[in-house]
């Protein structure tokens, strides 16, 4: 409604937007993906400055406006019909202009069911990335080997923590965890920035943003039609689009739930720009730190390890 007040502060809202849209995959791919593109670029020669720029350009494409645009579109549609038309906060409500009250029938329930299935697949992919990353870290630090039982235990711990947060509710559970998550992520980002080649990382961040925005229209339609046939597009870009779409029902519903009382302008700014800005900064700083080690410090093996074992990157 017009006079609804926001339920959460702007900072907490931004933290929950960030936590909802970006999971363990932000840690998993921030180093492994740019290094993989550096060593095996979709176009041109590998392991040079052009390959580095292309790697970051592709990385930004996969984690940029396209994905957050999907989340914003779904979230805004659900919020509009839920808070303006008093419809259920469910996927089927977005079909109200097309099928009217039949959203409360078999068609509407089928849409909700498809949304649940898509979310399960998206959650499964993220859980897999997270478990591999955690197990690799435990192996590196404490010698805890990769075993099926260790991974089952990690999955159980992750699910248990998620259940506890969900039971605590949005205000006492999700909001608090999102605030902690954002603070820890910012602290880690600043540590990498200032412990590494700070000036170089800031320069590459500016250049990466410029390269991304300049090539955004052409890269959005680039299917590498004139290059030699390969499975690169399906293994990377198509995978990402499917991943963002699979997560959109869950993330869209959550964004709509926490955004009551926000204006459309606030909503668009918050969902598109706040998490997007942090994501691009994170990817640039971590990605260019790794690329710098490969190109300027002779750690070529690090690039190959991103291909052989991405979870250790």
Place the predicted regions along the sequence by residue.
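Membrane-water interface regions at transmembrane-helix termini and the short interhelical loops
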Residues: 1-7, 55-62, 77-87, 136-141, ...
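Helix-loop-helix module between adjacent transmembrane segments
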Residues: 22-26, 61-132, 140-164, 195-198
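Membrane-interface interhelical connector segments
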Residues: 214-230, 287-313
């Amino acid at each position: 409604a017009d006079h609804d007040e926001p339920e959460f502060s702007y900072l907490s809202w931004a933290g929950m937007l960030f936590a909802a849209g970006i999971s363990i995959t932000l840690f998993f791919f921030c180093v492994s993906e740019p290094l993989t593109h550096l060593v095996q670029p979709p176009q041109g020669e590998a392991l040079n400055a052009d390959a580095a720029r292309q790697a970051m350009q592709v990385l930004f494409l996969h984690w940029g406006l396209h994905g957050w645009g999907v989340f914003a579109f779904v979230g805004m549609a659900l919020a509009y019909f839920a808070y303006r038309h008093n419809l259920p906060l469910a996927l089927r409500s977005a079909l109200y202009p097309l099928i009217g009250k039949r959203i409360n029938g078999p068609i509407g329930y089928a849409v909700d069911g498809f949304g649940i299935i898509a979310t399960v697949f998206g959650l499964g992919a993220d859980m897999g990335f997270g478990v591999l990353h955690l197990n690799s870290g435990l192996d590196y630090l404490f010698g805890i080997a990769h075993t099926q039982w260790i991974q089952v235990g990690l999955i159980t711990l992750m699910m248990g923590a998620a259940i506890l947060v969900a039971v605590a509710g949005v205000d006492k559970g999700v909001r608090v965890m999102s605030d902690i998550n954002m603070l820890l992520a910012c602290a880690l980002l600043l540590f990498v920035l200032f412990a590494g080649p700070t000036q170089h990382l800031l320069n590459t961040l500016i250049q990466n943003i410029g390269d991304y925005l300049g090539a955004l229209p052409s890269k959005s339609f680039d299917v590498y039609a004139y290059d030699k046939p390969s499975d690169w597009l399906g293994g990377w870009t198509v995978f990402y689009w499917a991943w963002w779409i699979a997560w959109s029902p869950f993330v869209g519903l959550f964004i709509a739930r926490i955004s009551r009382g926000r204006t459309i302008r606030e909503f668009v700014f918050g969902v598109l720009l706040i998490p997007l800005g942090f994501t691009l900064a994170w990817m640039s700083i971590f990605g260019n730190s790794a690329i710098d080690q490969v190109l300027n410090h002779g750690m070529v093996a690090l690039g190959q390890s991103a291909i052989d074992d991405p979870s250790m990157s």
